[in-house]
């Protein structure tokens, strides 16, 4: 009889162990899944944009959106996620977490709606507030078809109190001789935000003299924001008031930390605009540290007289600085490529140290910039690279508990599957999609 009871007991335990997770925590899973949106098709992406613009995501700070496949938007007219009303206000916007999971949205043509009254801010997202966007690549173009004042950012036109990480922009921008103002960048206007581990690959060209435009590889206009561990490899041809390889205009205590630009600088005009290898214009209380510019400087269309006062290897111009020491922009451990008549910054000659391109490709330069606090990886085929980054990815909690003999891949390892360490109790297993598509697994003992 005793053996029978024991047998029944273990049979019950076995059955319970194989029940769906719902038998233990249906409410928890239901809550986690209810605010999560999965996007795998173009139609689902367009529906998500329409839902945000209709107010379905208003106030949903816990919303989680996961892009789980590459999408091709060829032939589609893009309407930004978050669009304006008739008074140019943006009443509906995204405030949750958007996980790109390393996927690419390709052939996105921003041209048709750029400059229209309905889009004072424009991009994949028009405006985000309190949001997190990560692991997203945008590939496409914008050939300006309408004049206007637009905060344009390929990922986000405006980002307030938000974080953008691990995103790549491969979008070309051409003004097509139209008169435009606003911003051009991966993130047009960053307010109280952090932009990190992002890269711009797209070439920007604005050949018309404009009155108010900030253009940067990563951020156009940075206000009380931090841009760190970012890179620009796109070329910039510009006649805009503020153009920088990383940030167009840096002001209100904003910082650029550990970034580099290797894209070509092609300044246009008579020298009445600010153009810098890292930042176009720097303001009071701002800081640039551990950065380098190693791109070509093409002066063939630049007619300013020497010495150049608004063209610099680190920063082009200075704005809003009163002369008080606390207002003075700070520069630390920065380097720029040697070009005749181009200083680090005319007003702050010690903003950076001049080097040859050949030297910047050596291990000696890598040691110099890292010993002084820069965080880079040595690159035997060129200039130093940014440290490796694992961007956030959406976590998928399965509907089953597994026992301690479940075979999975350990987090951060790509070798053969191995068994979870033995132990008493059940384990909840969650999978995370990596940049390469490998599923890494987190394990948590319940």
Predicted regions located by residue number:
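Generic short amphipathic/hydrophobic targeting helices enriched at N-termini
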Residues: 9, 223, 435-437
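Positively charged n-region of N-terminal signal peptides that target proteins for export
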Residues: 1-12, 442-446
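Extracellular Ser/Thr-rich, low-complexity/disordered mucin-like segments
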Residues: 411-426
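C-terminal segment of classical bacterial N-terminal signal peptides
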Residues: 15-24
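Intrinsically disordered, compositionally biased charged tails
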Residues: 23, 420-423, 446
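Surface-exposed repetitive/solenoidal architectures
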Residues: 24-414
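A cross-kingdom C-terminal cell-surface attachment/processing module
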Residues: 423-443
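Sec-dependent signal peptide hydrophobic core
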Residues: 5-13, 426, 430-433
């Amino acid at each position: 009889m005793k053996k029978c009871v024991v047998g029944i007991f273990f049979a019950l335990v076995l059955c319970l162990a194989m029940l769906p997770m719902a038998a233990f925590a249906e409410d928890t899973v239901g809550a986690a899944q209810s605010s999560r949106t999965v996007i795998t098709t173009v139609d689902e992406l367009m529906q998500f944009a329409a839902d945000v613009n209709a107010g379905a995501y208003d106030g949903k700070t816990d919303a989680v959106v996961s892009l789980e496949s590459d999408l091709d938007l060829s032939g589609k007219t893009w309407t930004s996620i978050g669009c304006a009303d008739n008074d140019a206000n943006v009443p509906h916007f995204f405030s949750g977490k958007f996980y790109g999971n390393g996927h690419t949205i390709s052939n996105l043509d921003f041209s048709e709606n750029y400059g229209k009254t309905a889009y004072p801010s424009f991009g994949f997202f028009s405006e985000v507030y309190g949001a997190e966007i990560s692991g997203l690549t945008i590939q496409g173009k914008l050939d300006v078809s309408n004049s206007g004042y637009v905060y344009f950012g390929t990922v986000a036109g405006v980002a307030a109190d938000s974080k953008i990480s691990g995103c790549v922009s491969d979008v070309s921008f051409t003004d097509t001789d139209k008169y435009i103002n606003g911003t051009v960048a991966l993130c047009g206007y960053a307010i109280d935000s952090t932009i990190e581990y992002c890269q711009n690959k797209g070439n920007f060209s604005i050949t018309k003299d404009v009155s108010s435009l900030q253009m940067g590889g990563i951020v156009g206009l940075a206000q009380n924001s931090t841009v760190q561990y970012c890179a620009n490899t796109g070329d910039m041809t510009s006649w805009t008031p503020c153009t920088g390889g990383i940030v167009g205009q840096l002001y209100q205590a904003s910082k650029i930390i550990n970034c580099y630009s290797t894209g070509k600088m092609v300044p246009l005009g008579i020298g009445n605009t600010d153009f810098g290898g890292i930042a176009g214009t720097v303001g009071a209380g701002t800081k640039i540290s551990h950065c380098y510019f190693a791109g070509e400087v093409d002066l063939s269309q630049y007619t300013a007289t020497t010495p150049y006062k608004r063209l610099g290897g680190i920063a082009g111009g200075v704005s809003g600085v009163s002369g008080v020491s606390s207002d003075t922009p700070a520069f630390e451990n920065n380097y720029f490529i040697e070009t005749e008549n181009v200083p680090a910054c005319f007003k702050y000659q010690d903003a950076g140290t001049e080097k040859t391109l050949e030297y910047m490709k050596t291990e000696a330069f890598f040691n110099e910039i890292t010993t002084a606090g820069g965080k880079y990886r040595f690159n035997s085929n060129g200039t130093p690279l940014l440290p490796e980054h694992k961007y956030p990815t959406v976590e998928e909690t399965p509907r089953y508990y597994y026992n301690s003999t479940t075979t999975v891949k350990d987090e951060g390892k790509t070798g053969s599957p191995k068994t979870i360490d033995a132990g008493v109790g059940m384990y909840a297993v969650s999978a995370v999609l990596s940049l390469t598509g490998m599923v890494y697994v987190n394990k948590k003992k319940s």
